[in-house]
Amino acid sequence: MATVCVVGSGILGLAVASCLLEKTNVNIVIISDDFPHESSHDLKYSPFFTSPWAGAHFRPFPSVTEFDQRHVEYTRATYGHFKKLAAFEPQEETSIRFLEGTDLVERGHPNFEYYSELKQGYREEIEDFVVNDWEHGFSASYKTWVLNAPFFLSYLFKKLRSNPRVTLKQGKLNTLREAFTENAAKNDQSPDLGANGYNYVFNCTGLGLQMNGGWDPACYVIRGQTLLLKVPSGPHLQKTVTHQSKEGQWTFFIPRPLSNPESPTEDYVILGGTKQEKDFDSGSPRSQDSLDILTRADRLFPELKDAKTGHFQVIQPNVGFRPSRKGGVRVEREKVPDVENSFAYHCYGAGGMGYELSFGVAFAVVDLFLDDYNQ
């Protein structure tokens, strides 16, 4: 039985490993500098391990760019997979919840016409899609999903860790080549890769670790800052809303299931956010960013404020560096030129859409592997 290697344990790495378990009989080694924990409460905060701090919801989008259509296909596949998980797995384990999503796009927004004219990719395969009246522009609602990112990572991680076909190796690779051959240069943090390395390696490293080191030059970070809020009970806990201003600014809130330790039925809410491209300056929250988010929310979502104090109850701010890529997520097979019968399967650069794309890109990249493995 072959052994394959998955490099990276964010949402894409765990989704790929989960798909490999489901669709193949191979053994799997997962190499990562950071791993989730079996308990979501044990996660240590790091802006560079972005997956635990995501808002994690799905919103459809019209096909504006060439790579949007690929993303549409991946998001629909993920949507279908999450529907199955919600139907057959306990919510207290996956945290997945289906509810109403709403888009609000102001007139004058750069992509207003793509939404208002319902361009390709927006409403296809979306349940309960309805166009609403809204005096300031375009509005639509639809059935969507939300989840608690730390819970869901822990759910996947526990299933992988308990499977005898899966081995976890904590360490850091300087080059992707290290995973293929014992002769590659190692560093002090390199994990033990065995005698010969691996012939099949899935590159789920966010910014795209390259064969000879460094990152994919098409990749860049988007600094995202959000706020975790305690909010009053009400119908707002049964929906997620995304507002896009005419200036192109995004403001959203997303219920985070099972997040309130005081009440399993009253969720905290993720309020966001910032999209600061190529901003690697600070992994710490910025007070001005928090103030800007709260100022917009005060106008757009006053129902989230505490009724007694008239203020937002901020539990904590979160910062994550979303690994993005020009041209969209990379889902591609690469023959390693100087290592016999060896292939890299690239799966990285999802930006702020890691959860939305997760199982769609995972199934796609595993299919690429099966084309080689079954020959």
From Swiss-Prot:
<dbReference type="GO" id="GO:0005782">
    <property type="term" value="C:peroxisomal matrix"/>
</dbReference>
<dbReference type="InterPro" id="IPR006076">
    <property type="entry name" value="FAD-dep_OxRdtase"/>
</dbReference>
<dbReference type="GO" id="GO:0046416">
    <property type="term" value="P:D-amino acid metabolic process"/>
</dbReference>
<feature type="binding site">
    <location>
        <position position="12"/>
    </location>
    <ligand>
        <name>FAD</name>
    </ligand>
</feature>
<keyword id="KW-0560">Oxidoreductase</keyword>
<feature type="binding site">
    <location>
        <position position="355"/>
    </location>
    <ligand>
        <name>FAD</name>
    </ligand>
</feature>
<dbReference type="GO" id="GO:0071949">
    <property type="term" value="F:FAD binding"/>
</dbReference>
<feature type="signal peptide">
    <location>
        <begin position="1"/>
        <end position="17"/>
    </location>
</feature>
<keyword id="KW-0732">Signal</keyword>
<comment type="similarity">
    <text>Belongs to the DAMOX/DASOX family.</text>
</comment>
<protein>
    <recommendedName>
        <fullName>D-aspartate oxidase</fullName>
        <ecNumber>1.4.3.1</ecNumber>
    </recommendedName>
</protein>
<dbReference type="GO" id="GO:0019478">
    <property type="term" value="P:D-amino acid catabolic process"/>
</dbReference>
<keyword id="KW-0325">Glycoprotein</keyword>
<dbReference type="InterPro" id="IPR023209">
    <property type="entry name" value="DAO"/>
</dbReference>
<dbReference type="Pfam" id="PF01266">
    <property type="entry name" value="DAO"/>
</dbReference>
<feature type="glycosylation site" description="N-linked (GlcNAc...) asparagine">
    <location>
        <position position="203"/>
    </location>
</feature>
<feature type="binding site">
    <location>
        <position position="51"/>
    </location>
    <ligand>
        <name>FAD</name>
    </ligand>
</feature>
<feature type="binding site">
    <location>
        <position position="354"/>
    </location>
    <ligand>
        <name>FAD</name>
    </ligand>
</feature>
<keyword id="KW-0274">FAD</keyword>
<comment type="function">
    <text>Selectively catalyzes the oxidative deamination of acidic amino acids. Protects the organism from the toxicity of D-amino acids. Enables the organism to utilize D-amino acids as a source of nutrients. Enables the organism to utilize D-aspartate as a nitrogen source.</text>
</comment>
<dbReference type="GO" id="GO:0019740">
    <property type="term" value="P:nitrogen utilization"/>
</dbReference>
<feature type="binding site">
    <location>
        <position position="34"/>
    </location>
    <ligand>
        <name>FAD</name>
    </ligand>
</feature>
<keyword id="KW-0285">Flavoprotein</keyword>
<feature type="binding site">
    <location>
        <position position="9"/>
    </location>
    <ligand>
        <name>FAD</name>
    </ligand>
</feature>
<dbReference type="GO" id="GO:0008445">
    <property type="term" value="F:D-aspartate oxidase activity"/>
</dbReference>
<feature type="binding site">
    <location>
        <position position="55"/>
    </location>
    <ligand>
        <name>FAD</name>
    </ligand>
</feature>
<feature type="binding site">
    <location>
        <position position="322"/>
    </location>
    <ligand>
        <name>FAD</name>
    </ligand>
</feature>
